[in-house]
A protein has these predicted regions:
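Conserved NAD(P)H cofactor-binding loop of Rossmann-fold oxidoreductase domains
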Residues: 108-113
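Residue(s) in the substrate-gating loop at a strand-loop-helix junction
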Residues: 159
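Active-site helix of classical SDR
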Residues: 140, 175-176
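Conserved glycine-rich Rossmann-like NAD(P)H-binding loop of the short-chain dehydrogenase/reductase
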Residues: 49-64
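Conserved glycine-rich cofactor-binding loop
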Residues: 26, 33-34
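C-terminal helical subdomain
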Residues: 195, 199-200, 220-260
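Substrate-binding pocket helix/loop in short-chain dehydrogenase/reductase
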Residues: 116-117, 121-129
Length: 260
């Protein structure tokens, strides 16, 4: 029997494999101290990935790392404020020096502040822009060489506000629309390198941030009627594991029961 010849390059053969195995992959998850970011980080670790947990809350991260390791999961913590360029560059240097690779980058950190247009302070707009737009943009830019080398994947955890703006959400929604634009543009630039880019637009999810929003709106907070962070994490992991012949570009996910 003669061996069938193939004209695929090694990179093409890698990209066309039946599915993406997350075991031993290096994943960086920002906003990993709570909510959706925490759920995604734990889900990736549960699939065998080496997860770098990134947040401003180091104490919370270290407790999460301790818990993960008690269950034989691989995780490490890094305190990073995405509004500070020096923090981002320090994280990148650490990843380059210790891991030397990044297979998955998940952007889940962010700021959300709601107010009517007439009263919303520009300082709030600036803070949300730096955390939700500029920080993720710079971190992705700095990690692109490692992502290209790994034919990696980038996930932007956006918001339903990234698709539709509502009253009192003008500043936040503007940053989420900007994040979608960054993801769409990046996808066009890096697909040829084997990098996949996913935007996720969750509706209201049972997280501390959502509870705060309900309090601001003077509405009863019923987390059992909302999506759970693990729901979003399951969708993200499924998309990351899809065969390399395809790409999930956007996921819009909402609670089944609308309590708002």
């Amino acid at each position: 029997m003669t061996k069938e010849m193939t004209t695929e390059s090694p990179a093409e053969q890698k990209r066309s494999s039946s599915s993406q195995n997350l075991c031993d992959r290096v994943a960086v998850v920002t906003g990993a101290s709570s909510g959706i970011g925490r759920a995604i980080a734990l889900a990736l670790a549960g699939k065998g990935a080496q997860v770098r947990l990134v947040s401003r809350k180091l104490d919370t991260l270290e407790y999460l790392v301790k818990t993960a390791r008690e269950h034989s999961l691989r995780a490490s913590a890094c305190r990073v404020d995405l509004t500070r360029d020096e923090d981002i560059h320090a994280l990148v240097a650490d990843l380059e020096g210790n891991d030397g690779r990044v297979d998955v980058l998940v952007h889940c950190a962010g700021e959300i502040r709601h107010a009517e247009h007439a009263r919303a302070p520009l300082t709030d707009f600036d803070a949300q822009y730096r955390a939700n737009v500029r920080g993720p943009y710079l971190l992705t830019q700095c990690l692109l060489p490692l992502l290209r080398a790994a034919s990696g994947q980038v996930v932007f955890i956006n918001s339903s506000s990234g698709l539709r703006a509502r009253a009192r959400s003008g500043q936040f929604a503007a940053t989420q629309h900007a994040m979608k634009a960054i993801a769409d543009s990046l996808r066009e630039e890096v697909n040829a390198d084997g990098i996949r880019v996913l935007s996720v637009f969750p509706g209201r999810t049972a997280t501390p941030r959502t509870e705060q929003l309900f309090q601001e709106e003077r509405k009863a907070y019923r987390p059992e009627l909302l999506m759970q962070p693990e729901d979003v994490a399951a969708m993200v992991v499924h998309a990351l594991k899809m065969p390399r012949t395809c790409e999930v570009t956007e996921i819009s996910i909402r609670p089944l029961f609308k309590s708002y």
